[in-house]
């Protein structure tokens, strides 16, 4: 199947990045937590338990047609058909890797986001996107090269889980393992879309929806410190920090957000989150992508150990996954091994993440989708004749 590419956009400076709907449109029930659905149904004169029933139909049974909800009376079904709908992003393209990984390009308006299913052993992880593109400009990430368009809505986030669950189905029937974990590590910076990401994660945790343990839902952030400080008051899930550099000078270069929220500010915020979190077992996951002769030297490992000496953590080393026109190279196995061993000598738990789905550009850092960029950054690149790479997957 052929794929068209349209750019994504998410801008931190603009006031509103959400999708605008006309007042005449039906309400999408996937945009609601169970409490919000109860309030919606109360306005229709219905009792709270109807929200519980609807949530089960939508998320336990994958139902999106009111007429098929047999324990909801016909009067309410007819009422709902007039004012509400159940709508998740549609699958535009599916790609299956030789290692069992599946990547879906999902349609959101006239753009596409990417969602990745990663089975391994007795678990299967779904990597979910939070924005159409990304505004953070991390130099080693394919998504960042697409620019930014907008935040995803709650329904567009939880709808990725719903759509994937529908396709994966029951393990005993399809031979494909059901989703056991969800990671907010797809396209976008989740903490720049808190108003939609948090309700979506609440639905993931809700027993009337997916009922995932808070230890099986992970939010990964590049370090939007004020939002992380706020998140600890809103929800408790597993936390992963995209650190990728052991000092501010290098992190400023490869992750410009560090110029605003430096490493100390970020790690102080992490400590506050861990102090109140039950989901993290007292430890945060540190993600560190290895770039050949950029951040993978022995001196970098020693610096990283110093940065993390007071932070209970597990370190995930991520072999960098190439994308077109990227300015970096992949670290050799010997450099990866040396980096890992150096950190382990300090007593850290250090895992080298296995690359999955790289044959379909579904590996970490390779997600691109189709983004209509709205940032001045890519407009400037076009002005000065620099090519903007849009990947066709």
UniProtKB/Swiss-Prot annotation:
GO terms for molecular function: 4 iron, 4 sulfur cluster binding; metal ion binding; rRNA (adenine(2503)-C2-)-methyltransferase activity; rRNA binding; tRNA (adenine(37)-C2)-methyltransferase activity; tRNA binding. Pfam families: Radical_SAM (PF04055), RlmN_N (PF21016). Reaction proceeds by a ping-pong mechanism involving intermediate methylation of a conserved cysteine residue. This is Dual-specificity RNA methyltransferase RlmN. [4Fe-4S] cluster binds at residues 134, 138, 141. Belongs to the radical SAM superfamily. RlmN family. Keywords: 4Fe-4S, Cytoplasm, Disulfide bond, Iron, Iron-sulfur, Metal-binding, Methyltransferase, rRNA processing, S-adenosyl-L-methionine, Transferase, tRNA processing. Its cofactor is [4Fe-4S] cluster. Its EC number is 2.1.1.192. Specifically methylates position 2 of adenine 2503 in 23S rRNA and position 2 of adenine 37 in tRNAs. m2A2503 modification seems to play a crucial role in the proofreading step occurring at the peptidyl transferase center and thus would serve to optimize ribosomal fidelity. The gene is rlmN. It catalyses: adenosine(2503) in 23S rRNA + 2 reduced [2Fe-2S]-[ferredoxin] + 2 S-adenosyl-L-methionine = 2-methyladenosine(2503) in 23S rRNA + 5'-deoxyadenosine + L-methionine + 2 oxidized [2Fe-2S]-[ferredoxin] + S-adenosyl-L-homocysteine; adenosine(37) in tRNA + 2 reduced [2Fe-2S]-[ferredoxin] + 2 S-adenosyl-L-methionine = 2-methyladenosine(37) in tRNA + 5'-deoxyadenosine + L-methionine + 2 oxidized [2Fe-2S]-[ferredoxin] + S-adenosyl-L-homocysteine. Residues 120-359 form the Radical SAM core domain. The active site is at 114 (proton acceptor), 364 (s-methylcysteine intermediate). Disulfide bonds join 127-364. It comes from Haemophilus ducreyi (strain 35000HP / ATCC 700724). It comes from the Bacteria. One of its GO terms (biological process) is rRNA base methylation. Coiled coil: none annotated. It is found in: Cytoplasm. InterPro entries: Aldolase_TIM, Methyltransferase_A, RlmN_N, RNA_MTrfase_RlmN, rRNA_lsu_MTrfase_RlmN/Cfr, rSAM. HAMAP family: RNA_methyltr_RlmN (MF_01849). S-adenosyl-L-methionine binds at residues 188-189, 220, 242-244, 321. GO terms for cellular component: cytoplasm. Binds 1 [4Fe-4S] cluster. The cluster is coordinated with 3 cysteines and an exchangeable S-adenosyl-L-methionine.
């Amino acid at each position: 199947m052929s794929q068209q590419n349209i750019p994504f956009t998410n801008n931190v400076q603009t006031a509103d990045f959400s999708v605008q709907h006309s007042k005449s449109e039906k309400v999408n029930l996937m945009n609601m937590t169970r409490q919000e659905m109860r309030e919606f149904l109360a306005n229709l004169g219905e009792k709270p338990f109807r929200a519980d029933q609807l949530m089960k139909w939508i998320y336990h049974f994958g139902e999106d047609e009111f007429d098929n909800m047999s324990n909801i009376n016909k009067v309410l079904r007819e009422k709902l058909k007039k004012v509400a709908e159940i709508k998740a992003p549609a699958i535009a393209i599916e790609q299956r890797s030789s290692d069992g990984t599946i990547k879906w390009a999902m349609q959101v308006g006239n753009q596409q986001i990417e969602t990745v299913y990663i089975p391994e052993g007795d678990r299967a992880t779904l990597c979910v996107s939070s924005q159409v593109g990304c505004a953070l400009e991390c130099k080693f990430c394919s998504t960042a090269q697409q620019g930014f368009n907008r935040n995803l809505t709650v329904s567009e986030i939880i709808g990725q889980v719903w759509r994937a669950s529908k396709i994966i189905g029951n393990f005993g029937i399809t031979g494909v393992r059901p989703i056991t974990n969800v990671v907010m590590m797809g396209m976008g910076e989740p903490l720049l879309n808190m108003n939609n990401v948090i309700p979506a994660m609440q639905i993931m945790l809700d027993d009337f929806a997916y009922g995932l343990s808070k230890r099986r839902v992970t939010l990964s952030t590049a370090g939007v410190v004020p939002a992380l400080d706020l998140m600890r008051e809103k929800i408790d899930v597993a936390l992963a920090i995209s650190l990728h550099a052991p000092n501010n000078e290098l992190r400023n270069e490869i992750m410009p957000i560090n110029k605003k929220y430096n490493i100390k500010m970020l790690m102080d915020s992490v400590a506050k989150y861990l102090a109140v979190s039950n989901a993290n077992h007292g430890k945060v996951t540190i993600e560190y992508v290895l770039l050949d002769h950029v951040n993978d030297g022995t001196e970098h490992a020693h610096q990283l150990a110093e940065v993390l000496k007071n932070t209970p953590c597990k370190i995930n080393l991520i072999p960098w996954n190439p994308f077109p026109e990227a300015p970096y190279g992949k670290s050799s196995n010997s450099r990866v091994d040396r980096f890992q061993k150096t950190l382990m000598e300090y007593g850290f738990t250090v895992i080298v993440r296995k690359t999955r789905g790289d044959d379909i550009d579904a590996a970490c850092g390779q997600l691109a989708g189709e983004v209509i960029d709205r940032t001045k950054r890519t407009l400037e690149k076009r002005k000065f004749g620099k090519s903007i790479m849009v990947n066709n997957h």
